[in-house]
């Protein structure tokens, strides 16, 4: 397993997470190819992080899968914009950290799954119980 961390990217974490969810569990080569054609700004950064994680582990891109792609909130740059009548409004410029983990893909041999037969049991019908005062008075008399 190898990791890559890219810090303080000027990109909203919520926008980057939409892209990060798409590539989790994919082959690294397929993930980078699909990110190449995405129009989003975050796709370029996530593709760079995946290629960096592959290089950090010394793997080939076609032999690893993206185990996890996590986007965390980083520092928020705060700016002020002048508004009417001498007031000012705050502009938030969010940044994010991207962490990608890749794992070498293992070739799994096909395993035959045995299906267990379900045993059905029939339940006895429930007894009628009356617990009201009137019903118990009728039974006693």
From Swiss-Prot:
Biological process per Gene Ontology, one example term: translation
Bias (Low complexity): 117-134
Start and end residues of each stretch annotated as Disordered: 110-141
N-terminal signal peptide: none
Alphabetized Pfam families for the sequence: Ribosomal_L22 (PF00237)
GO cellular component: cytosolic large ribosomal subunit
UniProt keyword Ribosomal protein, yes or no: yes
Highest taxon, organism lineage: Bacteria
General function of this protein: This protein binds specifically to 23S rRNA; its binding is stimulated by other ribosomal proteins, e.g. L4, L17, and L20. It is important during the early stages of 50S assembly. It makes multiple contacts with different domains of the 23S rRNA in the assembled 50S subunit and ribosome. The globular domain of the protein is located near the polypeptide exit tunnel on the outside of the subunit, while an extended beta-hairpin is found that lines the wall of the exit tunnel in the center of the 70S ribosome.
Entry similarity comment: Belongs to the universal ribosomal protein uL22 family.
UniProt name for this protein: Large ribosomal subunit protein uL22
Lineage, opening ranks: Bacteria, Pseudomonadati, Campylobacterota, Epsilonproteobacteria, Campylobacterales
